[in-house]
């Protein structure tokens, strides 16, 4: 079974006025100078999954300037035994829309037909910056295993915004809180359980794997207030904590307060204390473990988006990465400034050269 794009078209997306790629399922090596528009192609592929893509941008910001006419992406997705035509677009700053096989669909529906994971340069500081980035990284992996995680997360965020609004307005009437806290407890408990399941799946995929990259021990750490085990316990904790939350002006218990702890397993060293090279290797290892797990769980490895990853690995690690990607059968989209970075891939990949002329990107398959 496979998961890959067989075609991709960009219209007025970022620096690309028009780009069309025909694809055969092999990894895609995209090369060209810095600023040419390589990452914009990876961002386009990331939008074949729910959410705001690898840059977390608004739909309006993705439109080509100065026209700002809106943008459109179209792709043909081979997903296991099915072929889907997928379109996603935004009209002049409007919210992103999705069609699957010609029918309007919610973004969350993309999670049922595609799995997309990425590593981008801003994630290099994942282990040493704030918990929000680590939660986002964990939730992206969780979403790859459990497509409904996107919807339950949206529902949780909506309920929390509403409760926080009550707290900031110093509303004390318990009737205003009861329904919101039940919804927070139901969705929050589901988020917590989903994350734990994803971590279990990742641990199993790392155990005994033949890989050149170091295994990571991952632990989900609750916030200072802990994380109750059941829906009823979380609901009660939210109710009991109202006065505390009123003083803070926000909700202080729930999965939005959690953190992801990582350690270099063989050394027993916290990821935050590892060298930058080791931290990068741990991230690559986790992405590959996620891909191995999905090959078993979903039936095919995910689409992998690796932006400037090759440049930060030595030649041996680079070759090992390519070997693992090809052994998995994953369609990995990789960027680099020169073709030499992909020498050890050889004819196992398709190559696309991206150039820029006065702010207009051109993508040329070789």
What do the PLM-derived regions correspond to, one by one?
Residues 307-309:
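Walker B catalytic acidic pair
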Residues 1-33, 47, 175-186, 190-303, ...:
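Conserved NTPase motor "head" modules and their coupling/switch loops across ABC/AAA+ ATPases, GTPases
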């Amino acid at each position: 079974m496979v998961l890959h794009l067989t075609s991709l078209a960009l219209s007025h997306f970022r620096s690309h006025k028009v780009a069309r790629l025909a694809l055969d399922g092999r990894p895609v090596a995209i090369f060209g100078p810095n600023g040419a528009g390589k990452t914009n192609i990876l961002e386009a592929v990331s939008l074949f999954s729910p959410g705001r893509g690898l840059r977390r941008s608004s739909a309006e910001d993705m439109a080509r300037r100065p026209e700002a006419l809106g943008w459109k992406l179209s792709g043909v997705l081979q997903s296991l035994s099915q072929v889907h035509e997928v379109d996603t677009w935004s009209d002049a700053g409007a919210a992103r829309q999705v069609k699957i096989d010609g029918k309007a669909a919610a973004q969350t529906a993309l999670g049922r037909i595609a799995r997309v994971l990425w590593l981008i340069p801003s994630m290099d500081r994942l282990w040493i910056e704030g918990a929000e980035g680590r939660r986002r990284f964990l939730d992206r992996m969780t979403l790859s295993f459990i497509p409904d995680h996107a919807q339950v997360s949206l529902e949780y965020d909506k309920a929390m915004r509403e409760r926080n609004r009550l707290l900031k307005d110093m509303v004390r009437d318990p009737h205003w809180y009861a329904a919101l806290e039940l919804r927070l407890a139901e969705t929050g408990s589901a988020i917590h359980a989903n994350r734990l399941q994803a971590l279990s799946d990742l641990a199993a995929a790392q155990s005994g794997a033949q890989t050149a990259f170091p295994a990571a021990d991952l632990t989900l750490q609750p916030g200072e207030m802990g994380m109750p085990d059941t829906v009823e316990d979380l609901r009660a904790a939210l109710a009991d904590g109202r006065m505390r939350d009123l003083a803070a002006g926000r909700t202080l218990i729930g999965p939005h307060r959690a953190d992801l702890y990582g350690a270099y397993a063989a050394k027993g060293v916290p990821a935050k204390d590892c060298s930058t090279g080791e931290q990068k290797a741990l991230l690559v290892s986790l992405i590959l473990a996620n891909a191995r797990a999905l090959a078993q769980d979903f039936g095919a490895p995910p689409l992998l988006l690796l932006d400037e990853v090759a440049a930060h690995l030595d030649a041996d690690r680079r070759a090992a990465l390519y070997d693992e990607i090809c052994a998995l059968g994953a369609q990995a989209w990789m960027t680099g400034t020169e073709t030499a970075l992909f020498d050890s891939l050889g004819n196992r990949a398709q190559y696309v050269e991206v150039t820029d002329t006065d702010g207009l990107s051109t993508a040329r398959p070789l």
